[in-house]
Structures are given as structure tokens and as C-alpha cells.
Amino acid sequence: MKKILMMLFTLFMSLQSVQAMNVDAFIDKNIAPYTDAIARMIFFPIKIMGAEVPVIILWILVAGIFFTVYLKGIAFWGLKHAVDNLVKKPEGNDDCGDVSSFQALATALSGTIGIGSIAGVAISISIGGPGAAFWIFAGAILGMSIKFMEASLAVKYRRFNLDGSVSGGPMHYIAHGLTRRKMRWLGQPLSVLFAILCIGGGITGGNMIQINQTAHQIIFITGGENSIFHGYAWVLGTIAAILIALVVMGGIKGIAKVTTILTPSMCALYIISGLIVILANFSSIPSALALIVKEAFHPTAVAGGIFGTIIIGLRRSVQSNEAGTGAAAIVYAAAQTKEHISQGFVALLETFLTGILCLFTSFAIVFSGVLENTHIGEISGIELASNAFQSVISFFPIILSVIAVLFAMSTLISWSYYGQKAWTFLLGEGKKRVITFNIIYCLFIIIGSAMNVKSIIDITDAMMIAMCIPNVIVLYVLAPEIKRDLADYLKRHNMNFIKF
């Protein structure tokens, strides 16, 4: 802890000696070219009916459709059982794990319901039009079956360390699941690839975009170009880095205690605020809903037409709910349960709730009418959402700022754990290795706060979505055993309305 705080303090003092505007510009100028190059490589496109469609998006779309059909629409009939599993009392002391199922869900939600649920959705709608909102939610529905697979496999293939703590997630079910099928030659390299991508995804999507958009919102509500923080975004990043360092050193149990309180509170606050904006524009609801559906299938001002809108919506959906990335499976592996299928059902709620929150952002923006005369690049996503809230009540941007900070901090906390587990999977368990990762993670909070939003968005989507490549490959391979386990689970729990 002292090492992390001392390093951050030293960096803070050294940056004070440089003109603030130059610090932000220097960071963006020297980091952005590398992030742009990575994004272009991962989002390699092919042309379909005149639209450039990234191959990786098609990869995830096909997986969502396949697993939804393969598991017979579990996203629809499994929700009630998911709630039942979440509220039931623990089965006894035999349940192994670090955190309860609810704590695991809260931590996973805090990782997915980040600033992307506000800023990312706003940016996607400004680019893809109102129709993007439809495809963002559709992507969440398709992603639920994928999340079920990930959480179930994470618990099934988790490992218990010598100190009694749990390690699990895609790294482990890729390595051990394929080894069990005599495919170690494939499992080892894919697990290593996933761990590397998870670290990258944690540093970008779980870190840099969160602090970047939060810093922009704080600067926006404190005067914009006249704000005392204008040009000093790195100062806000340094403060956040210190706060995160204080939390993450408590490990998963400490993280779970924070997220269990933070996640329900911030979700409730955002939903109430969103409802006020929506109800204030009640007369516009029918026409706005009709516009969303119409633009989803017949967009009027989007490059690539319907395919352009679908790709923009699905791309944001994946970044928001993380289905296919396997990230949340890392914390689900730590859940106190003997039934891996049971935790899979609980995971359905995470993706569904994330989709609902994204809908609230979409509705607030579309219903308020702030999309008119909005041009991407001239305004950040969080500012667009802020304008929607401000259109109803003048001080709402302040409330949104509080929500944005809560969303960002919770995501920063959860992804520090995901990245840490990927780091120790590669380098081995050990206190020094954990501290090293935490230092690196906190330094990138400062870097992310000062970068241009366009560079952040591109590398965030690229690194997060790239995690789907090794993860989804193994989901296909291990799907038959999860289907058998699910059939057995349903039989034992007298859920005979679905036959496998």
C-alpha cells in the first residue's frame, strides 16, 4: 500500500512542475497513435451490402444467436429462477468460495455498469442514431445465454489456492477444460492469450474510459474551459488513483463489501433520475419509441444503413454488458455455491440489468430531443447525457456527475480484480506480483484521465471485444458438457417445462 501511494505521490509532484495543458496534450499525443493502431487491427472490416462490418462483431453476434437457440431461450425462461437463486438462503457451510452469490453479482454489475452505460451509449446514439438503442438492448438479450455459459464454467473449473482463496474465470476453464478434452495444445496458448487481453481490457475499458469520461463531466459542470480543472484532468486522475489504491488492497472480500453497498445505491439513483427525465417528456414517448424502432430498421442518416446501425449498437452492447468477454466470470468463480449451473442462472440478471440501464440512458437522450445539432467529436458522451438531464432540471448535471463518479469508481474497483487475476495467472500468485499490477493499474488511471475521448473509445472497444476471440472458441467446445449439466440440474430441481 505504501509503495503504491508513494509512487503516485511522486508522480503527482513531478507533474506539477510541467505546465498542465502540456501534460494532457503530451499524454494524448504519445499514447493515441498506439491505441489507434491496435483498434484498427482488431476491428478489421469486411463489406456487407455497402457497410463495413468488423469481423469480430459478426463473431459475437453469431455466438449470441447460437447459444440462445442452443440453450432454448434461457434468457427468457431462466430469469425467474435466477431471482430465486439470488434470494435463497445459503445451503450451509459446505458452500465454498470467497463471496456470496449476491456479492458476486454486485461486483460483476459494478464492473459492467460503468461509465459506458452513460457515456458509451450516448456516443453510440449520436453516431448510429436513435435506432442504435434498439440494437444495444437486443445485444444484451443475446448476450445473456453467453453469460450463463461463462459463469457456469467459471465455477466448475475454479481452483482453490493454498491460502483458501479462489482463482477462476476463462483463463482456467480454457486451460483445464480443454486439457480434460485432451486439447492441452490449444488450451495453454488460448488461456495465455485471454489473460493478456484481459489485462489490456482492464486497463482500457475497466480503467481509462471510466476516469476519462468522469473527468470530462467534472470539468463540464465546473465551468468547462473556465473550470479550475480544465487542462488539469491528470489531477483528477491522480486523486482517483489514490482512492482506488486504498480499496483494491483489501482483495475480493474488501471489494465485494464496497460494491454490495455501492452498486444497488448507484443503480437506484440513476433509474430514478432517468425516470424523471422520461416522465418529463411523457408526451413525446410514443413518437420517440416509434422513431427508435423505425431507425433501427430504416436509419436515415447513418453510414452503412441498417448494418451500420446494427454494428454500432452491438459494438456498444458488448462493451457495456461484456457478454462474450468472460470478464465477469472471474468474480463469479469466487461465489459461495456448490452448483455451477445455479451461478450461471444468477449471471443472467447481470446482463439483463445492464441492458435495462442502457435503455434508460437511450430513452433520456432520445425523449429529451438533445440529439439535434449534436456532432460526435465536439462533445463527449457524458456531456450529451448531461444535456439530456439538464433539459428537465438545471441542477441534474450535478446529480449525473455524482452517478458518473460512482459508476466509474465501482468499475475501476471490479476491473482491478479481474486484471489482477489475469496477471497472477500469467506470473503466479504472490503479494509482490499483486502490488506490481496495482501500481501499473493506478498509473493508467492518471494516463486515461488526460487522453482524448476518441482514442479512449477505440482502444476500449478493441481490447474488450478481442477477449471474445479465445473465450468464445472454448465456449463452443465446452457447450455440450454445460448442456448436459443443465439438463441434470433441471431434472433435480423439478423444472420439467424445458426439455434438453
Show where each model-derived region lies:
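N-terminal alpha-helical transmembrane segments of multi-pass membrane transport
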Residues: 2-115, 125-132, 143, 476-500
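Membrane-interface loop-to-helix entry segments
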Residues: 3, 59-62, 67-83, 208-218, ...
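Flexible loop linkers connecting adjacent transmembrane helices
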Residues: 73-101, 123, 129-133, 145-186, ...
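Alpha-helical membrane segments and immediately flanking helix-loop junctions
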Residues: 94-127, 153-156, 162-177, 193-199, ...
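Membrane-embedded translocation segments of transport machinery
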Residues: 249-260, 265-333, 338, 387
